[in-house]
Amino acid sequence: METEDVTVREQIFHDRVRETIICVLLFICLYILSHFILTHFKKSAEFVTDDIEDATVNKIALWLCTFTLSVAVCAVLLLPISILSNEVLLTFPHSYYMQWLNGSLIRGLWNLVFLFSNLSLVFLMPFAYFFTESEGFAGSKKGVMARVYETAVMLLLLSLLVLGIVWVASALLHHNTARESLYDLWEYYLPYLYSGISLFGVLLLLLCTPFGLSRMFSVTGSLLVKPRLLENLEETMNCAVFEEASLSRKLKSTNTCWISAHLEALNKEFLSVQSKRITLELRKRASPWQRNLVYPVAMLLLLALTAVSVLMVCFHVLELLFDESAMPRGMEDPHLGLASFSMLGSLGAAVQVVIILYLMVSSVVGFYSSPLFTGLLPRAQDTTLTQIIGNCVSLLILSSALPVFSRTLGITKFDLLGDFGRHDWLGSFHIVFLYNMLFAGLTSACLINTVTWALQRELIRAFGLHRLPLTVSRSTIPLKLLLANGLSKIH
């Protein structure tokens, strides 16, 4: 009996060591990926300066941002990893090489992401921001440690302020919780704070994702070679070349006084024309199949993914009306390998993973396309450290809310693990139902608006009516004129 107990303890120990090694390896890979991403966007001048102290502070802040971004990427991959792990165990239930893939590993990964998300949002990112802005207390010896002391004091004051706000909010919303002791900080107040942050992230996803789904068509179109009906590409390219040469001569000339006053605007115009000319050259060199096949296929794929997403949400709305099990809820043990989380089996699970990743990409596109957050848009080798911190915080809020967002919309049946499912508002039928209806309505409205304007714009460009004088209102152009102009070009 004693030998069996020792064997069980050894097995538990080896399982824990194996899970720790897997989580560490995954995090190292994501950290390296995040490091390359931030290195591509960071402003190198902030890290190579004559002031060694500022350079050291910026490097430490960049390390914290890299950690936060890696946690955000891991949060995005939580649901895809969980869904695919379940399908792998269903396909290979007795495989010796798949014994490491179990519910304990997935549950531990969810708990670690929840812990590090809290740590990054509440402590690391505020510390990084205050650290870069600090100079040390007046009269103290200058150095990195002086900045650390000032940052620690600022962070302590901010923590007390946030804790007070959370306590007041919990007391107003739930009268009994006002009697909670401060000893319940870790068990109650921090999860309550994260619940509020998660609710904010879910609401932000509700606004950004429909807008991003409509913007995905234009963003993808700008990256691909578009087919142009009835367009003289050679003529358009010659115009762009002549315009670029003219602007280049104006920039090189320093004799006229007005150039120095309008140099910045002229330079922006030159870069825009140059980018247009490069795009035209790429289109000219593109093969016929790339010019006429890739773009339509990509648009059809985006349209199919968007339509499937909206249909899944509409179907989930009907489920909410007739089935209580459709409500999002939390669970402690995922029970992997027992049944598929999709009625279509492995194919349906693969579709769920693709839809979840597609919605995340769309939400990021919508976030950076919105007027409120365009200033945060990172630029290669020209993003300040403050912007990097803001981007990391924003992406972490969006990604940490993605599991709750996907489960609330019914994209997947995989219930939320650990503290991700301990949000009070998840149990409210009215909130969940209204959320699904708003998402379906906003997405449909954005798509209808985008497709209508895009179709009108493409028709105008295809028939050459974009060259009309500005005094002519294009909205009043009759259909007969469109057809007549198009037929004359064909002949």
From Swiss-Prot:
Keywords: Cell membrane, Endocytosis, Endoplasmic reticulum, Membrane, Receptor, Transmembrane, Transmembrane helix, Wnt signaling pathway
Ranges in the topological domain labelled Extracellular: 1-20, 81-111, 174-192, 314-346, 406-427
Biological processes annotated in GO: negative regulation of canonical Wnt signaling pathway; receptor-mediated endocytosis; signal transduction; Wnt signaling pathway
InterPro entries membership: LIMR (IPR008075), LMBR1-like_membr_prot (IPR006876)
Any one annotated GO CC term: plasma membrane
Transmembrane segments: 21-41, 60-80, 112-132, 153-173, 193-213, 293-313, 347-367, 385-405, 428-448
Cell compartments where the protein resides: Cell membrane; Endoplasmic reticulum membrane
GO molecular function, one term: transmembrane signaling receptor activity
Membrane topology reported for the UniProt record: Multi-pass membrane protein
Sequence ranges on the Cytoplasmic membrane side: 42-59, 133-152, 214-292, 368-384, 449-491
Main localization (coarse): membrane
Similarity remark: Belongs to the LIMR family.
Subunit structure: Dimer. Can also form higher oligomers.
Function: May play a role in lymphocyte development by negatively regulating the canonical Wnt signaling pathway. May act as a LCN1 receptor.
PANTHER family the record matches: LIPOCALIN-1 INTERACTING MEMBRANE RECEPTOR LIMR, PROTEIN LMBR1L
Name of the protein: Limb region 1 homolog-like protein
Organism of provenance: Danio rerio (Zebrafish)
